[in-house]
């Protein structure tokens, strides 16, 4: 028997009779529950059993037998090819990443502890809604305005400027009054710290008018607003709320924030309830609330597009040919499309809306990324959902379009959606590139980069070490061509040293070419490297072709929340080094100069 335990109760999720148990072969056994179709892996060795969910902890992919495994202990994820040694429950590619959650063994009973359904606390019976009482207006990307009786709530306001340094730009033109709507909001929910959801250019405009608007975020391990002080944006009413607890706004309106299982340090989602009617927004969560979500909500919205990563577009060497990239991207988008359709079908919301995927690599220097990084089409996803679950109403939003929830619930055939007037500009055609790129490039001439010892100071601050990886970082121009006199250096993270040549020992190696303006902006301000990687601002090659989860996870999510003390650094620079030095340093062999 496989059991699940909710709080202190258990229920059977998979039952194996004695014949089925006897027939388990040594090694890996794949099993599916006939009741709910959920999959499990049972590993048998010397008569002992181990079991886990057949679901990769990276992004939820399904495991299959690894044809390269000669010992019969390893399975491979069909999504990103991560590998799990089921005998140890350790991921072996990438190494040192996750530990798979093992189902506890007790004789032939295997038990899993799972999270309960917190939205069931203090249940509310749905009340009849009047026309116009609850409306949902799509503004752009992940930004929605909810009119909930007398209250206005806004999700993830990104209304101006780029995201991820200069890599992402808004695809849709927000309605002309979007900023005014934001300033009139009664409350704002920001799901996580990524800059397509937490947009400091947008919040800077908001703070000039409404610095005290209530903003709600989840209590993530890395604070959502960890960069607030450095941003110099003045917001005075940020509320960090615990997960899984109803937050009451008035007698009819409440909301609950839930965290993601895969990225609990930052990703969250939200349930909004008004007069017993639920709206579920899973945002970018890979596995929100451990996969347990409310069924039959009135409205569900989620991401859908894919393409929110530099992989594989920014990689070169080995298998990374253009044809391989195209095939990989096509397959990934198809898998994501099918996953979203299946998720929506399983949850059976009355209405579903795909959003949070309307971005474009608009800057001319990123034309290659724009052409290569194809994304899912919202209308195609909705068509797939309608085919498999015809009872679900779908909505493909346009900027300024309004969904009236009461009308939609009364009859899907009624005119519940009001689209923007004919002739409205749907797609952006101007982004003020120079304004934002020039701001990033101002870091190039910062005083700290006149002294090559900034490299050692920065990586000691970053705090990543005792990991067998050697990285070469190269500063480049817009086209990723190394800059004459630009910095080109090695970091050996095994002992956090800065050699002039690669070590003689056998070692994993990664070469990262970064646009100089973005890299120096990131270094100067102590920002996370998602600006480089998710923002398509670098180009990468690696030997061997292994994803180093610990390295990238550290630099994308675990850097210190307090930035480098560059004032202290400049005070420590010897006086004879304070005269102007080259902006970078490069040896004839391409190796970095020795740091002292």
Predicted features, each with a name:
Residues 217, 290-392:
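Cap/insert and terminal regions of metallo-dependent hydrolase folds
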